[in-house]
Amino acid sequence: MGEETLLENNAFERVFTAVATFVRDNEAVSIDDVVGHLRKTQKMEGTRETLKAQRLLVFAILGWQSMLYRPAFNTCSQDVFAVHEDWDQSNSGLVFDTNKVSTDLADRPFFVILKGFGNLLPSPRNISQVASENSKTAATWFSLNPAETNAYLLLTLLHVRIRWVDCLALHLDYNKSTRTLSLFSCPSFCVAMLRSKGTIFSFASTEKSSFDPRANEEEISQFMREVLLSFRLLFGQHGPSRKLFPRIYRPTERLQKQDELLPLLCMRKYIHQTLLPFSADQPVYFAAQHFPVLSERIELIAKELKDSRPTSMRELLRDRRDTLQYWTFWLVSIYGSIGIILSLLQVIFGAIQLVQG
């Protein structure tokens, strides 16, 4: 099946659907497995000359269906799987280690290829120990208070630039040097994948143990639930952040349209949890319990905020994290102002008496 054939008679749509169906119905498949299936069912050419192009096609379709990466075209040879990197993409080093992987891995399971690019599907840092309220490690949990960890403070205190992306792997990717935070702009996709067990689950690892942990199916589900919950933490549970959202949101170049679920997560004070597949809002979150997969990323920005201090009067007025400091400042300001006014009145009355005398 050549390029011209793909554009005729809905051939591409059939191939697109065939890939989604095959990877959903089979575990630990490779790109070569998918190519073999397409050659049998979609009458794709079975020659060595077309194998490289067919591998790249399958790699691209998997990226589009999972939204974990954007495939790059015509940037290197056909012996390399390449992902697209935007000109303004912040390379924090937490997600992508490289944007190219050899096609020699085409006969390996998807999760092996994905791990070659970096940490696109994160897994919990300590998967052998499940966090619970009775855990002895509870004292070391990092707390996340929506009043202290939110988009409003990120912008006003750290002057962070929020970058809306259509790459799920980049969600909560924070570059400290450029102070750029990437947020996934399509939360509805996470809901759809959780309900349909879609293509993203084909990247699940089947290895029981590994020195380099890779996400299994349950951890992929947890990852997407945490993506949804993170919008509540950063926006929905903090009044100034809810008001800030419509001013800072910008649709991505490819989508050009706002995800309908995004303003619901970011601008509603309360959400009926039965409608969405994630836990209820909490007054305080703990990274180990509520964000076991994304804990490293979310702790990074929370610690940045915790260590930051207002550097101007304007920032001081907006920073209410330290309630004692905030109200002490206002009380001192009020009493100081009253003292200045009384002193000024005393001078005025003294001047009046002097004139009258």
Language-model region placement:
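Non-transmembrane
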Residues: 1-327
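C-terminal single-pass membrane-anchor helix
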Residues: 320-357
